[in-house]
Every structure is written in structure tokens, then in C-alpha cells.
Amino acid sequence: MALKEYLQDPFLKELYGSIRRAGKIQSISMDLTHTCNIRCTGCYYFNDHMDVGHPTASEAVFDAFLQKERERGTNFITIVGGEPSLKPGRLREIARYFKASVSTNGLKKIPMKGLEKNLSIGISVWGDAQTDRRMRGGGKIDIFEKALENYHGDPRAFWYYTVIPGYASQIEPVVERCVANGNPVLFNFYGDLKSIGNRADHRRGFAEARQAINRVVDRFPHMIYMTSYISEVVSTGRLYDQKWGYEVCTSFSTDNPVNFERMQNGMPYSPHFRAYNADLQTTRRCCTGIDRDCASCFDVWQHFSWIILNLRKHLGSKREFTNWLTTVYMFYLINRLIDYDSGKKNIAEIHRRLCEKTPNIAVLDNVAAS
């Protein structure tokens, strides 16, 4: 079947139209600062020493950077760190000119004034209060509790829940608290960069986590911004005949010589994308690594891009196209690239469709023959 035939479905046509009207997204990521107010166990930023040799840019460099990116055609920025909430003034400047999504640990509230629009806020959580305190708060700081307080009912906010493989039983109670707080949830998956092992070891797989995610989708279909398809691709590292790794990753700095050979291998990538260090003058290999082994990367942001840039692989059936289209739609909705208030009403229907069982063709053939 062709794309035109799939779009005869009114719901798919609506989703597709919303994405087309948003226009082409030209994105980058940037470290707003090289400093942070906590140290999470296994944080990719400090584990790969991304703070070393790239001090936070001066105001003059920051202003020049924004102007340069506007001229280059950038219209969407993923803001990471260090900890971006430490620089609220710079967040306001970014939101004046770009749509943006910021990742925060939640300890310091990002103010509302001057940041009412053009900004989505992903709040990190890694498990229940005890696990989060141990993994992110140094065993002392109740970051999850503070973040719940800071972002209660905040329309800009969603939870960016990094699931640790051996702690799948915590997913449902944590999501209950997030939803009760008035915030939707997107999932990420933990890479054991500190070699903690045992329950934290990503090599044990995320099958139990996926099952728990599917259960919270059933319970809160309007509040979970990850589909079963996205969850499977990210946590297994499989996309059709491709296995996740540097050779297929689509989000890397195209101006950095370390990636020039990768750009020649025929696999799709985003030609505009760059991952800027905190000095805003240099780029690194990709969003989440300098020398990191990509086998430990379960970053949902980069896997979103992997799926999105592989449309052709998803044209074999209406179900496959639906997997692709709903992935794109989720990314656009989370980041307010489409109208958020009307778009979020489609989330429950997206989950309903993706939870439908695909008919077993062999069984149907046997029935027809009898």
C-alpha cells in the first residue's frame, strides 16, 4: 500500500496534517552551562567529562551564538547541561527566538515569567523516592519530592522517567504520583555507565520495564507520551534490520570531523544537527557522548530521531506507518511543535490503536481454507 492509501484513515490524516503544518524542524542541542547542583550516578555528562575544557560561555558569546543559529535556520533547541535551571535568564532569551525543550533535575524550579510559551520542561526521575535519593541525591536529597512540589500542575512540564532495568516494579507507583501531580510521563532507559551491575545493568534487558510501561499506558492512556512501539525500539536497540549503534545513529554533530566518515556510509542523518558544548563554540560527537560506547545509549531523544528519519522502512503496511506517524506526533507534541491543547486529546486514541492486536495471517488463512 502507498502513503496516500494509509492517509484515507481520517485519524492518521489528522496527525499527518498537524505535522506537515508545523513545517521542517531544524534542531540542535546545547549545554546551557557546564555546572550542576547534584551528581547523578551514571550521568552521561560528567561520566564522559563533558564539563572539562568547555566552560560556560560569556554573555557576549551566548548572544552571538543565538544570532548565528537564527541565521543558520535553527528553529528548535534541546537544552541540556550541566543543569539548565541555574541559568533562567538565558532560558528566557532562548524562548524569545526558538521553540525549545529543557531537561532539568527538578531541584530548582524554572520560573514561569517570560517562559510561559515555546518551552517544554522534562523533569528527571529515576525511580521511587528512595531509589531517586540514592541514585541522584547522594543518599541525602529528596529530589523527586522537591520536583513534585516545584512542578505541580505546571502545563509546561512532563516527567522524563529513566527506568533502571531491575526496578521495573517501581514504574506504576512512580507514574501514579506523576499523574496525580498533573504531569504527563515520557520514559527513558538507564545505561549503566558506572558499571554498578546487578539490578542496574542494562545488559539484563528491559522486558519487565516494557510490561510495566504497557500497564501504565492502559491505566493512564491520556498521560503517557511513549508508545509501545517507541518503548520496544529504544529498549531493544532494534529497528527492522538495523541494530542500534554509531553507524545508524542519526543525531550527531555534522560539523565535527570525527563524524565525517559516518556521514558517508549511506545511513540517514540530520544534516543540520549539532551538539554544542557549554562554551557554545565547539561541538562534540553527539548529544550524549564523546567516547561513550553506543551500546549503553538508550536515550529516547536520539531514538526518536532514528525512527523519524527512517520513514521508508515503515511503509510496508498501515500498522507500520502508524508506528512511524505516532512516533513523530509524540515528539512534536511533547515539544509543543504542534498545538498542544488540541494535540494531547489524540494521545489516548494513539495508544488504543497501537494496542490493537495484529491479526495472525496464518490463522486467518487456515480459517479461509476450511
Placement of each model-derived feature along the sequence:
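Conserved alpha-helical substructure of the radical SAM core
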Residues: 2-105, 109-113, 317-328, 355-365
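Processing junctions and N-termini across compartments
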Residues: 30, 34-37, 243, 288-291
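Short cysteine clusters
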Residues: 36-43, 249, 294-300
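Canonical radical SAM enzyme core domain
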Residues: 50-64, 82-118, 123-131, 138-143, ...
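Flexible mid-to-C-terminal extensions adjoining Fe-S/redox cofactors in radical SAM and related proteins
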Residues: 261-370
